[in-house]
Amino acid sequence: MEKWQCTVCGYIYDPEVGDPTQNIPPGTKFEDLPDDWVCPDCGVGKDQFEKI
C-alpha cells in the first residue's frame, strides 16, 4: 500500500497502520479516509498530503 506524507509537518500516513488516534483501522487506504480526516500531528486536511 502507498504511504502519504504531510507536506506541512512531515507526518507519514501508513495504511498498514491506519490512524489509531482517529479510530482509522489498519488496512485503510488514504483514498478511503473520511473527508474530514486531518493530520494527527498538525491538523491540516488530506489536500496537504502527497504520495511518497
From Swiss-Prot:
Keyword Hydrolase among UniProt keywords: no
Cofactor(s) needed: Fe(3+)
GO biological process, one term: alkane catabolic process
PROSITE patterns per UniProt: RUBREDOXIN (PS00202), RUBREDOXIN_LIKE (PS50903)
Keyword Electron transport recorded: yes
Pfam families: Rubredoxin
Residues engaged in binding Fe cation: C6, C9, C39, C42
Superkingdom of origin organism: Bacteria
Matching CDD domains: rubredoxin
Domain Rubredoxin-like stretches: 1-52
Gene Ontology molecular function, alphabetical: electron transfer activity; iron ion binding
Keywords (A to Z) from UniProt: Electron transport, Iron, Metal-binding, Transport
Cofactor-binding details, from the entry: Binds 1 Fe(3+) ion per subunit.
Function: Rubredoxin is a small nonheme, iron protein lacking acid-labile sulfide. Its single Fe, chelated to 4 Cys, functions as an electron acceptor and may also stabilize the conformation of the molecule.
PANTHER family according to UniProt: RUBREDOXIN, RUBREDOXIN-1-RELATED
Assigned protein family: Belongs to the rubredoxin family.
Stated name of the protein: Rubredoxin
Species this protein is from: Thermoanaerobacterium thermosaccharolyticum (strain ATCC 7956 / DSM 571 / NCIMB 9385 / NCA 3814 / NCTC 13789 / WDCM 00135 / 2032)
